[in-house]
Amino acid sequence: MKKYEVMYIIRPNIDEESKKAVIERFNNVLTSNGAEITGTKDWGKRRLAYEINDFRDGFYQILNVQSEAAAVAEFDRLAKISDDIIRHIVVKEEE
């Protein structure tokens, strides 16, 4: 299993309940595909460096994950489709 850091930005005009549902749904995508979430950080609402989809800020979420590539690929696929996530990145950590 490899270690990954996943960062995604949730659109800012979402209510608190829906935000929690999005976080839970994407955590479940990883865990149901065999990933182990070793750490999570909620950076809260931050200003973006540039406008994305007419949004100037967003809710940052960072996950440290230990998994196979398939779980991360599924997260990546679903994050691209989701309207709630305006930007995401997955980085493989050095051993």
Curated annotation (Swiss-Prot):
GO terms for biological process: translation. Pfam families: Ribosomal_S6. GO terms for cellular component: cytoplasm; ribonucleoprotein complex; ribosome. GO terms for molecular function: small ribosomal subunit rRNA binding; structural constituent of ribosome. InterPro entries: Ribosomal_bS6 (IPR000529), Ribosomal_bS6_CS (IPR020815), Ribosomal_bS6_sf (IPR035980), Ribosomal_S6_plastid/chlpt (IPR020814), Transl_elong_EF1B/ribsomal_bS6 (IPR014717). Keywords: Ribonucleoprotein, Ribosomal protein, RNA-binding, rRNA-binding. Binds together with bS18 to 16S ribosomal RNA. Belongs to the bacterial ribosomal protein bS6 family. PANTHER family: MITOCHONDRIAL 28S RIBOSOMAL PROTEIN S6, SMALL RIBOSOMAL SUBUNIT PROTEIN BS6M. This is Small ribosomal subunit protein bS6. It comes from Bacillus velezensis (strain DSM 23117 / BGSC 10A6 / LMG 26770 / FZB42) (Bacillus amyloliquefaciens subsp. plantarum).
